[in-house]
């Protein structure tokens, strides 16, 4: 499953869907909103936006990259859009593999690739302002065709 959703993530369902009789490992990565006071104020929430047509395609491409590189039986990547409060999940990656090494490596690869190539942008919102953060290649306007 590769999806971009606007509702809270149900990681339990993703783990259940990943279980296979030929896989002895299920590695899960869940990215959550943390209260980070590095900018002088606590983060109240994160807000995610995406260029949907490309983001959907890029998640599927990452899944194909993983399947071509590691011996895995299942890959799920789900990213949430909209407002995500402290402690809530914004991204879930679940990889099932015959052995734990490939499962861990593939899940780490997935989150790093998401940050590199998937056009999803995060806005950190504090009580006194906000900032857009991210390291994707290109800006929101460049990816969506606006200048």
Regions found by a protein language model. Give the residues of each.
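N-terminal, polar/charged subdomain of small-to-medium soluble alpha/beta proteins
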Residues: 1-90, 96-108, 112-147
């Amino acid at each position: 499953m590769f999806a971009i959703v606007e509702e809270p993530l149900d990681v339990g369902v993703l783990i259940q869907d990943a279980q296979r009789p030929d896989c002895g490992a299920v590695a899960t990565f869940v990215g959550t909103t943390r209260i980070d006071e590095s900018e002088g104020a606590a983060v109240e929430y994160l807000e995610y936006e995406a260029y949907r047509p490309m983001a959907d395609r890029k998640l599927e491409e990452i899944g194909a990259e993983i399947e071509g590189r590691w011996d895995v039986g299942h890959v799920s990547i789900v990213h949430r859009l909209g407002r995500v409060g402290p402690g809530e999940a914004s991204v879930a990656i679940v990889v099932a593999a015959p052995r734990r090494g490939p499962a861990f490596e593939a899940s780490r690869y997935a989150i790093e690739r998401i940050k590199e190539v998937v056009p999803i942008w995060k806005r950190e919102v504090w009580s006194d302002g906000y900032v857009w953060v991210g390291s994707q290649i290109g800006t929101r306007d460049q990816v969506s065709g606006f200048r």
